[in-house]
Structures are given as C-alpha cells and as structure tokens.
Design a protein with these regions (language model features):
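N-terminal BTB/POZ boundary and linker segment
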Residues: 61-107, 152-162, 185, 189-264, ...
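Post-BTB helical module
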Residues: 155-216, 317-395
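Ankyrin repeat start-site detector
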Residues: 1, 46-47, 325
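Conserved ankyrin/ankyrin-like repeat signature
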Residues: 17, 29-30, 60-63, 118, ...
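Canonical BTB/POZ domain core
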Residues: 99, 104-106, 111-177, 248-261, ...
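Ankyrin repeat domain, specifically the short helix-to-loop turn at the C-terminus of the second helix
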Residues: 20, 32-40, 66-69
C-alpha cells in the first residue's frame, strides 16, 4: 500500500479511498490484545460466525479458532451472575426437583416464583407440597427446559438452534411473551446473516440480559423478607407482587426484634460469613412459632436499617446508599465478607469527594482496601496539592505511609507521594500544563523536605 496515497486521500477528504484501505487493516496484534482483555469469538454462535467471516487474514482466523479464552463470566467479573449460575448448576439448598424424561433439574421455589407468575400459581395449586415434580408431556424437551431455567436464574439463555421451537413452546406455556419476542428477533438476525454469508454455520443461539429485569424481580424476595411493620417505604417496585406469592423462606434472621424471612441459598451463596454461620449454628437452634420448620438466627451489632440495605444487596446486587448510611454499610460489608457491596459503597463515597473530606476518604479506602476509591482520592489530591501541603494532617499521612513501607531506606519511594506525582504529571501536553505541574511538584517536594523525607 502506498502510504503517501493514503495520507493524500485523508487530507483531501476522500472517504471512499480511506474506507478501501481500512478494509485491509488486519492487525493480528490488535486481535490478540482484544482477546486477552475479554473479547470472545465463540464457534457456532451468531456473533462468533460473523466475526470469523469478517476476518481479514488466515492468521487472524486461526488465532480466533485456537484461542482458548476464559470469558468474562467464567472469570467471575460479575459476581452476581456467577452466583446465580452456580446456584442453578449446583442446586445448593434447592427445595424442588423437576423430572423431565429421565433428566433431573434442581431448582428453588423462591427464584421461580419471583421470575414467573405461572410457576407461582402452579406451586400453590397443582404442585403444592411436592418436592419432586415429573413433567411427562412428550413435547417438553429436557434441553429446552434447562434453557428456560437458565433464563429464569441468570436472564441469559444458550440454546441449540434445533431446540428453539421447543423453547418457544415452553415459553408460551409459562406465559413469557418477552422471551418469545427475543427468540424470534434473534432467529431473524441469524437467518439474515446466514443468507448473506454462505458457508457459515450457526448452531447456538445466545440471549444476553439487556436490562435489570431479573435483578428487579429478585428484589421482590427482599420485599417479601421484610417484616410487615417495616414494609412501608421499602420495596416499592413498578409491578409489586409480594402480597400475591409466598417466597418459601427457610431461615429467619432476627435483628433488633424484627424477623426477616430469608433464604439460605442466597445468604450462603453470597457471603462466606453467613455460609459458615449457618452451617455451624443449627444443632439445637430456636425455631419460629408461626413456622416451626424455620430456624431463627439472631444477628447482633447491626441495626435493622442497615440490615435492610444488606438484604437488598444480597438478593438483587444493588441497594440504596446515602451519605448518612454508606459508612455503616461499608463496615457491615467488610464484616460479612461482601466485596461487591464494599465496591458499591466505594462508588458512593467517590461521589462525595471534596477538599474537606479527601484525606479521610483516602484513609477509609486504605483501611477497607478499596483500590479504585484510593486512586480517585490521590487524583483529587493532585488537583489541590498546593492547598493540601499546608495541612498538618496531610504531612502526618505521608509520614505514616512512609513508616508502613517495610525496611524503608531514606531514598525509597512512598506510595502516597508516588501516586500523587503520577496524577500531577499524567496527561500533561501543553507548556502551560507543564508549568502548572512543576509548581505542584515543587510544593510537594518542599513539604517532603520540611518533614525530613526524600523519595
């Protein structure tokens, strides 16, 4: 390719020529970078086949075929999705089994009731009191039933194209109009793609969750768990069914005299603290008088208001945080081993950053190991360093951070100072910005000299 011709076309605004050259840009290094950072090209899926068809060289095509990547879900980047998938696959604390033409599927009544009005009705009528439910109808395909369960639990579905019609039939029976629409839309996409790209083979349809609907419906279980006297003001969802379906609780948490009817599957799956607590606690525990089969566990050192915030996080991966409660929730999240809730608190604290609290926020981030919040604090410090160096508390923080470095020598670096210097000098591109950065660095160096530190 003539580089001069390309540059001339760019200057002239010859878009058609630039587009022609761009189609030749098959950079193998870029493909490797994308794959290493979570991009995926799954064989026999619609998106995967489209990606393979569009490969610009044989080397890239081979790279896509041979790359054994761990997907974002397998790497547990989204802990909530991973928890729900594990709950489905392992069936821990399941309270119902479906037998479909010789195949057994473990499930949880609470999840199916929250996600489907059809299952809610069936559990209270035809299937009431049954722990093993045989589904003998010849048109019920086990693979399609498994895909429907996957959709209930995760909002996602992976289904062989040969089973799509079976899935749609089941979805119709379960009154899942939205799922039918999604399947038909995806089938149309695949048909149009395969028609225009001969030689491609799509064997698996994948539906990805495109909204928070399944989280909102799981939050109904938190609504149900609330004691009647505390329900006013909480759990106000657009389509509130909490008065119309039982949630089948198997554990009662008593907090400040209030009884929260919950599920071991969620609390044990979300928190190792509760997992250990519930597995070790009940040899001769207290039982509820109204529900003799439900054990009671009294939780101390937490207010019922903060427990409610934890409750909604456990069920829906989200909760309402405010400047008034975020520090208390953060302490509870740390104590109950809920790293996702800690990160949620970190995001809320980051929105509260100001000159008056940045030093306290940095200490909080260090204490609770919130690396993202810690970095945001040092970035904020870099912006106001000329005023910050005048505060004795800031000098004390630097001394303390220097003292935390094991076997530190006089000229060794100090993590806090290094991070501030990085943010001062990053993205400096103009002469005026360089001058401003130098003034800030001089102010920081002068403070270090005053307190007798070098780094």
């Amino acid at each position: 390719m003539d580089a001069y011709d390309l540059f001339t076309s760019c200057r002239k605004g010859d878009i058609s020529r630039v587009r022609y050259y761009s189609c030749l840009c098959g950079h193998e290094e870029l493909v490797q970078y994308l794959l290493a950072n979570g991009a995926k090209c799954e064989a026999n899926t619609f998106d995967g086949e489209r990606c393979m068809y569009g490969s610009l060289s044989d080397s890239i095509r081979r790279l896509l075929k041979e790359y054994k990547c761990i997907t974002a879900q397998a790497m547990q980047r989204d802990y909530y999705d991973h928890f729900l998938l594990t709950l489905l696959e392992q069936g821990q604390y399941s309270d119902v089994k479906f037998l479909v033409h010789g195949e057994t599927f473990q499930a949880h009544r609470c999840v199916l009731s929250a996600r489907s009005e059809y299952f809610t009705a069936m559990f209270e009528t035809k299937w009431k009191g049954k722990n093993l439910i045989p589904l003998k109808h010849p048109l019920i395909n086990p693979a399609a039933f498994g895909a429907i369960l996957q959709y209930f639990y995760t909002g996602r579905m992976d289904i062989d194209v040969s089973h799509v019609e079976d899935c749609k039939r089941l979805a119709k029976q379960c009154k899942m109009g939205d799922l039918i629409d999604e399947l038909e839309s995806k089938c149309k996409q695949v048909y149009e793609f395969v028609s225009n790209k001969p030689g491609t083979c799509v064997k698996v349809l994948t539906l990805e969750p495109h909204s928070c609907q399944h989280q909102e419906e799981m939050a109904q279980l938190a609504d149900c768990a609330l004691p009647a006297e505390l329900k006013v003001g909480f759990g106000e969802l657009p389509f509130d069914r909490t008065d119309n379906f039982p949630s089948y609780p198997d554990i009662c948490f008593r907090v400040e005299g209030y009884d929260f009817l919950c599920h071991k599957a969620f609390f044990c799956g979300r928190s190792d603290y509760f997992k250990a607590l519930l597995q070790d606690h009940f040899s001769e525990g207290e039982m509820m008088q109204s529900q003799p089969s439900t054990p009671v566990l009294t939780i101390h050192n937490i207010s019922h208001e903060i427990f409610i915030r934890l409750l909604y996080y456990v069920y829906s991966d989200d909760t309402e945080l405010s400047p008034e409660n975020v520090f208390d929730v953060l302490c509870v999240a740390d104590m109950y081993l809920l790293p996702g809730l800690k990160r949620l608190c970190g995001k809320t604290l980051a929105k509260m950053l100001c000159e008056d609290n940045v030093l306290h926020m940095w200490k909080t981030a260090k204490l609770f190991r919130l690396s993202r919040l810690e970095d945001q604090c040092t970035e904020y410090m870099a912006k106001i360093i000329e005023r910050l160096v005048e505060k004795p508390e800031f000098a004390d923080m630097i001394k303390e951070d220097a003292g935390a470095v094991e076997d530190r020598h006089e000229t060794d670096s100090i993590p806090l100072v290094d991070d501030i210097r990085f943010h001062i000098t990053s993205n400096v591109q103009t002469f005026s910005a360089i001058e401003e950065a130098n003034v800030k660095l001089d102010a920081l160096d002068q403070l270090l000299s005053t307190i007798g530190l070098e780094c």
